[in-house]
Amino acid sequence: MILLNKKTKTRIKEQSIREAPSECCGLIVKNERNKPVVFPCENVSKEKEDNYRISPEDYLAASELGDIEAVYHSHSKEYHWD
């Protein structure tokens, strides 16, 4: 299990608000200092309001920064969490 600090949660929340009504998506990558880093990704789904699909280019770029620890996405039709 990964525990996210407040700064990380805030970055994901801000992305979800910016990209609404589309679902946002991204990856949590552990960098060389073993710290989790938010890596926002482009949602390339044809049905962005109901689904997400991370672009292969974003996945590759994130994997080059460190180990991918988690995938996140929003539920754009539901309440934004705090």
What are these regions (language model features)?
Residues M1-I68, S76-D82:
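Conserved beta-strand-loop surface patch within small alpha/beta domains used
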